[in-house]
UniProtKB/Swiss-Prot annotation:
It comes from the Bacteria. This is Probable chemoreceptor glutamine deamidase CheD. Probably deamidates glutamine residues to glutamate on methyl-accepting chemotaxis receptors (MCPs), playing an important role in chemotaxis. The gene is cheD. Its EC number is 3.5.1.44. It comes from Burkholderia lata (strain ATCC 17760 / DSM 23089 / LMG 22485 / NCIMB 9086 / R18194 / 383). It catalyses: L-glutaminyl-[protein] + H2O = L-glutamyl-[protein] + NH4(+). It is an enzyme of class 3 (hydrolase).
Amino acid sequence: MSALPIATNRYFDNHFGRPGVKLLPNEFYTTSEDMVLMTVLGSCVAACLHDPYAGIGGMNHFMLPDDGADPGAAASESMRYGAYAMEVLINEMIKAGGRRERFEAKVFGGAAVLAGMTTINIGDRNADFVRRYLALERIRITAEDLQGVHPRKVAFMAATGRAAVKKLRLQVPGVTEREAALAREADRARTARPRPQVELFAAKRPAAPPPARPRIELFGARSAAPAGGVRAANLSRKQEA
């Protein structure tokens, strides 16, 4: 397999006053430096992990949930799938000195940004996947901002674990086109997949309701966020470009 797709678009973030890295879809980044990791999400999901003891943080950006990853494919292709993207992020955090049992997660994205998307909601699938995956890995979700209809801009401070999220206008250049392509890909995969056999006389218990998630403070609020929580921030319009 080829080299892992580590984000390389480094810049200086004037709003947060520190160096930053912009993550594109299928990329990830881990660091112990005082940096801001930035990405823009539609139906995609970004998982942000932090080890508060080691001061190490990381972010990924995946496009589809757990199915379809080919072990022989290039890493940049496999990173589009959540199962592989989460495995890579966790392993790279451990290599950097983090401990799995100390990891805390903040998760973002999973929006339904295409009007009329009802039968194939990639955002819902991605959101459900990342919650289930982290529960199985026993990594606690300390904050989340998932689903809805708006794209998001997410900033994550790797060294401290602080995060900020901004809801964007519905039509963001590049995001809408990417979402339409993802919907077509998911539709092709769904129609090509063989129909499962019907299991007769198999009564299933109703699923338990999902646990309540921590509330987060959105942009525009002036009150200070609690330590370690998702902090509201007023990102300038210049940064939305």
